[in-house]
UniProtKB/Swiss-Prot annotation:
Record's protein name: DDIT3 upstream open reading frame protein
UniProt GO cellular component terms: cytoplasm; late endosome; nucleus
This protein's encoding gene: DDIT3
Keyword entries, A-Z: Cytoplasm, Nucleus
One Gene Ontology term of the molecular function aspect: DNA-binding transcription factor activity
Compartments where located: Nucleus; Cytoplasm
Organism domain of life: Eukaryota
GO terms, biological process: artery development; calcium ion import; diaphragm contraction; endoplasmic reticulum unfolded protein response; ER overload response; gene expression; intrinsic apoptotic signaling pathway in response to endoplasmic reticulum stress; negative regulation of fat cell differentiation
Length: 34
């Protein structure tokens, strides 16, 4: 149970980082093409 919750937290953090990276890239992309 503890391991499962830890894995869930890690996966959630990973998806959050991915989303943040995507938005940052989008920002850079927009700034680069304006």
């Amino acid at each position: 149970m503890l391991k499962m919750s830890g894995w869930q937290r890690q996966s959630q953090n990973q998806s959050w980082n991915l989303r943040r990276e995507c938005s940052r890239r989008k920002c850079i992309f927009i700034h680069h093409h304006t």
